[in-house]
């Protein structure tokens, strides 16, 4: 996985101060960025030139305070062929020595009016998501009441049909058939569609449907956090399914675990409504409202009262 410099420019709306077309095609392979503070003093041990170099007010002020020849020399040491680009934040004026060094070393110089901390956060978040290792899973990813719900199950059980019904009920399709999932951080999973399948859903007997064309832009979403997994399986009278919601099960992807529930599919059951309820119930639990715990408390209280009455 890699990101091109021109993609970063487009995403963060950066201005190009210097950058030939071929320089904007440079690949970025590391999500980390560097704010070169010590490097400007001449200390280059552990310097990582493969990262994007971000200069804020502190770095810029120190650079401007240096004599012109020293400024040029330190920038020449910083700007190496493997450096993807240099970004100057806060709309600060790029020194002539920086432009000279960039031309000689063939490195794009970019600027942004955004504050350094904000720009750093946006850039890191974007690179983390783009460069994260993807895991492809079979299923349908839906945005239900603002929650990312991954619907899985055996082939032919009705995942896509359920997704289409959820779209008709006002929810949004993120991905059908193949969902590319990546860990945005240690506790968060995100999912997105394969580019070739974006906004498309396959219904047996009908064919491929362009959800955006049929239902509008409000019916689709380019990516979503994956917060809950729902596994559809055929109803089996010999199998016990969770009736109280107290049997915790998890799905682990890329080292991150999310809760998973199993829903038996049976003729006459409205699976889309059940999944809606599951999503709302999960959100209620996250907010501290647990119906299972409430039922358990009521049952315990009832048993205690009966014991007192029968004593």
UniProtKB/Swiss-Prot annotation:
Binding site for ATP: 153-160
InterPro entries, sorted: HPr(Ser)_kin/Pase, Hpr_kin/Pase_C, Hpr_kin/Pase_Hpr_N, P-loop_NTPase, Ser_kin/Pase_Hpr-like_N_sf
Catalytic activity: [HPr protein]-L-serine + ATP = [HPr protein]-O-phospho-L-serine + ADP + H(+); [HPr protein]-O-phospho-L-serine + phosphate + H(+) = [HPr protein]-L-serine + diphosphate
Annotated stretches, region: Important for the catalytic mechanism of both phosphorylation and dephosphorylation: 201-210
One Pfam family cited in the UniProt record for this chain: Hpr_kinase_N
Keywords tagged on the record: ATP-binding, Carbohydrate metabolism, Kinase, Magnesium, Metal-binding, Multifunctional enzyme, Nucleotide-binding, Serine/threonine-protein kinase, Transferase
Source organism, top-level taxon: Bacteria
Gene Ontology terms for molecular function: ATP binding; magnesium ion binding; phosphorelay sensor kinase activity; protein serine/threonine kinase activity; protein serine/threonine/tyrosine kinase activity
Biological-process GO terms, alphabetical: regulation of carbohydrate metabolic process
Broad class of enzyme this protein falls into: transferase
Cofactor(s) it depends on: Mg(2+)
Active-site positions on this chain: 138, 159, 177, 243
Quaternary structure and partners: Homohexamer.
Domain characteristics, as noted in the entry: The Walker A ATP-binding motif also binds Pi and PPi.
Described purpose of this protein according to its UniProt entry: Catalyzes the ATP- as well as the pyrophosphate-dependent phosphorylation of a specific serine residue in HPr, a phosphocarrier protein of the phosphoenolpyruvate-dependent sugar phosphotransferase system (PTS). HprK/P also catalyzes the pyrophosphate-producing, inorganic phosphate-dependent dephosphorylation (phosphorolysis) of seryl-phosphorylated HPr (P-Ser-HPr).
Stated name of the protein: HPr kinase/phosphorylase
């Amino acid at each position: 996985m890699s990101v091109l410099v021109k993609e970063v420019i487009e995403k963060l709306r950066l201005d190009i101060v210097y950058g030939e077309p071929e320089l904007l095609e440079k690949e970025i392979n590391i999500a980390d960025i560097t704010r070169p503070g010590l490097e400007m003093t001449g200390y280059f041990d552990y310097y990582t030139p493969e990262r994007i170099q971000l200069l804020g007010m502190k770095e810029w002020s120190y650079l401007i305070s240096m004599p012109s020849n020293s400024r040029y020399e330190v920038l020449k040491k910083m700007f190496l062929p493997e450096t993807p680009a240099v970004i100057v934040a806060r709309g600060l004026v790029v020194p002539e020595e920086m432009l000279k060094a960039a031309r000689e070393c063939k490195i794009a110089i970019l600027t942004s009016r955004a504050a350094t901390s904000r720009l750093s956060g946006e850039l890191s978040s974007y690179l983390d998501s783009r460069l994260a290792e993807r895991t492809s899973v079979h299923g349908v990813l839906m945005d239900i009441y603002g929650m990312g719900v991954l619907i899985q199950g055996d082939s032919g059980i009705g995942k896509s049909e359920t997704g289409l019904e959820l779209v008709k009920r006002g929810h949004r399709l993120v991905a059908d058939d193949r969902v590319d999932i990546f860990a945005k951080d240690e506790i968060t999973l995100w999912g997105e569609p394969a580019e070739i399948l974006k906004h498309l859903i396959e219904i047996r007997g009908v064919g491929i449907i362009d959800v955006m064309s049929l239902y509008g832009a409000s019916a689709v979403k380019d990516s979503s956090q994956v917060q809950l997994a729902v596994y559809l399986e055929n109803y089996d009278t010999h199998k016990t399914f969770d009736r109280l919601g107290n049997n915790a099960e998890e799905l682990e992807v890329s080292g991150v675990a999310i809760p998973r529930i199993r829903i038996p599919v049976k003729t006459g059951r409205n699976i889309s409504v059940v999944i809606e309820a599951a999503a709302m119930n999960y959100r209620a639990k996250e907010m501290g409202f647990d119906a299972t715990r409430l039922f358990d408390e009521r049952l315990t209280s009832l048993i205690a009262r009966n014991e007192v009455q029968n004593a």
